[in-house]
């Protein structure tokens, strides 16, 4: 009291109420570049008014009235340390919930693998791929099902030095700039059979035919006339390689480099003689290449003609444009067909690029008698008396000539080589050289009466006529230079052999 006296002590016990804080539970989910935090909060004595989110272990918080929050713009494949708490209406906070969450990482992926540009010894592999979280840095390629790998920064790779006609199991995967890899994806491809051009690389065209087109008599309709084998008694015996039969793949595109060979530039291989390939024009020559000195045209008889020309210019063997001006001299050196049409006009009109590929040849133009080359002559007999033992030893050096009678005879199938030349019309379906229009050969008839040369009739037989009286279609014939090489082609009419220009 006022004078300093104290009362006695009164003791009692009092208990205050406990304050209930809010409580939380937290779940998280992630994508490549974001993390979403979801909070399930239970209020205590106050209402929940705000949520607080941190992605950097509590260094910085973002407040929100919402119970979920998404952190965007994150780095893929990265671990983030999350903290979350809530505040109630009385300013009281929950305990801090801690979570660890990593953003997802999208690996690079390969969606497509294809094989292209397949040859006999190479295959190109093409890859379609996406980078995922990072860009692609390298492509890995295997040709042996993943045993060994090569790598490149390019999405295509060409395997070379492969074996022909072999199936390869190719595998591919990619890596990104962070070193992450895709899964492997594969494709199988079989290398081609070697093309003739590949097999003949570095060889002359003549050697290519002898060593790669010819394998044995009859294969590819090609026969070696070496006096050996089934037809040895009927062969020429000159070691030539000759195409025989109905329609061998012996086409050559000569005089043009366009993708589809014009029909006027199609030639066919008679054979290989020594180191030279001998060609004959597939169809009859036009005025544009042979020029003047023709005497009218002929409309081919559709019953016989095998070509596509609407009309064919006709030339006398002696060469003038009118038989009134012709001589009946059947000497090839004096023929204007030879000197003007073939060895001047034709050579000039095909151009120097192509004429320079034609060899100057010693043509055997001595000829022989009616009996030796026609009436009593088989194909071999005709060859003997036309080439080996002509009536005269006359030769003529020039680039362009016409077919020999024996060329025509040996173009028929070998089972017909014992036919008489006068009966070759019976086997025209087995003779690729037959075209169905009268045409001159280079071979003169010797003896009397004079002034005659042999020709192939429209029905496929052999006959003779006066050089100043009959006019026929002309198919230039020549030997290629020995150094000419093959560039491409299979020898078919649609894919003829192409020569290196």
Each predicted region: which residue ranges?
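Proline-enriched interdomain boundary motifs that mark the N-terminal boundary
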Residues: 19-27, 106-115
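Solvent-exposed loop/turn segments flanking beta-strands in beta-repeat/beta-sandwich domains
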Residues: 42-56, 130-144
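Short strand-edge motifs at loop-to-beta-strand transitions and within beta-strands
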Residues: 67-69, 155-157
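Conserved aromatic anchor
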Residues: 33-45, 121-133
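Beta-strand-rich modules
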Residues: 1-5, 71-92, 159-180
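Long, domain-scale functional regions
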Residues: 194-501
């Amino acid at each position: 009291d006022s004078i300093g006296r104290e009362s006695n002590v009164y003791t009692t016990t009092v208990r205050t109420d406990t304050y209930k804080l809010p409580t939380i539970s937290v779940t998280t989910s992630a994508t490549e570049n974001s993390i979403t935090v979801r909070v399930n909060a239970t209020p205590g004595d106050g209402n929940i008014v705000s949520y607080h989110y941190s992605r950097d272990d509590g260094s910085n918080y973002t407040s929100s009235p919402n119970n979920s929050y998404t952190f965007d713009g994150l780095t893929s494949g990265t671990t983030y340390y999350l903290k979350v708490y809530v505040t109630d209406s009385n300013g009281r906070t929950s305990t801090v919930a801690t979570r660890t969450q990593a953003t997802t990482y999208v690996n690079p992926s390969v969606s497509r693998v294809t094989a292209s540009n397949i040859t006999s010894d190479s295959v190109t592999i093409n890859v379609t791929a996406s980078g995922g979280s990072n860009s692609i840095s390298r492509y890995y390629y295997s040709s042996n099902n993943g045993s060994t790998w090569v790598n490149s920064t390019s999405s295509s790779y060409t395997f070379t030095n492969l074996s022909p006609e072999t199936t390869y199991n190719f595998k591919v995967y990619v890596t990104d700039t962070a070193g992450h890899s895709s899964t492997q994806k594969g494709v199988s491809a079989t290398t081609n059979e070697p093309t003739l051009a590949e097999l003949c690389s570095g060889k002359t065209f003549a050697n290519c035919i002898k060593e790669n087109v010819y394998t044995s008599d009859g294969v590819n309709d090609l026969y070696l006339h070496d006096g050996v084998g089934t037809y040895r008694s009927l062969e020429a015996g000159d070691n030539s390689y000759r195409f025989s039969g109905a329609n061998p793949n012996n086409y050559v595109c000569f005089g043009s480099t366009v993708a589809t060979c014009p029909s006027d530039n199609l030639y066919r291989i008679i054979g290989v003689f020594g180191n030279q390939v001998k060609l004959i024009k597939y169809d009859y020559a036009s005025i544009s290449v042979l020029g003047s000195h023709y005497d009218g045209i002929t409309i081919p008889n559709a019953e016989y003609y095998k070509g596509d020309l609407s009309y064919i210019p006709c030339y006398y063997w002696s060469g003038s444009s009118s038989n009134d001006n012709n001589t009946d001299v059947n000497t090839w050196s004096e023929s204007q067909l030879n000197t003007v049409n073939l060895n001047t006009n034709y050579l000039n009109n095909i151009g120097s690029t192509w004429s320079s590929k034609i060899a100057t040849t010693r043509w055997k133009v001595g000829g022989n008698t009616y009996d030796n080359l026609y009436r009593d002559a088989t194909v071999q007999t005709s060859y003997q008396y036309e080439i080996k033992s002509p009536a005269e030893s006359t030769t003529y050096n020039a680039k362009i000539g016409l077919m020999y009678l024996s060329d025509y005879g040996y173009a028929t199938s070998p089972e017909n080589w014992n036919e008489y030349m006068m009966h070759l019309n019976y086997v025209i379906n087995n003779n690729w050289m037959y075209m169905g229009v009268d045409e001159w050969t280079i071979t003169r008839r010797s003896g009397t009466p004079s002034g005659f040369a042999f020709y192939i009739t429209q029905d496929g037989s052999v006959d003779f006529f006066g050089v100043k009286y009959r006019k026929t279609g002309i198919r230039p014939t020549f030997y290629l230079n020995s150094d000419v090489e093959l560039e491409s082609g299979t020898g078919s009419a649609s894919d003829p052999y192409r020569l290196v220009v």
